[in-house]
């Protein structure tokens, strides 16, 4: 009996130690049910039938991999009816010492950490675009923070496509932290 308990106890301690040091990303201001607030949904001017405030959520993270020199954040709707998904937000070149993005970062970059850069999304412009799935179907919005081994992604501007940012992100990745928010209307 003791020989069976010891490996289990050691596994429990090593799992707990790993969990404390794992690279994690967290949604800091969700709704009561853990999803998006009305203010974080897409606004009416986009023409998709939603009437939210289009305000970006607050996010925080901890324990990035050793050697991290910057981060890239993406918010991706893998269920968008496009055959390709839909990129809702791309923020590149987040400095390595930053551990939080505040709520309400504007499309013009207001409230964005110094040095960080929002690039084009699938809405065609830089900045956060809130959730607005077609009625009756739940969508999964994947928030991914990638730790990078470079301080700045090469050849990236505010007009860069999500695919170009994704290419250079993958080429320079040290690790990822992610979570998913499900939303339906």
Located regions from the model:
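Bacterial N-terminal signal peptides that target proteins for export
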Residues: 1-7
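Bacterial N-terminal signal peptides
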Residues: 7-16
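N-terminus-centered regions that define maturation/targeting leaders and the start
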Residues: 19-185
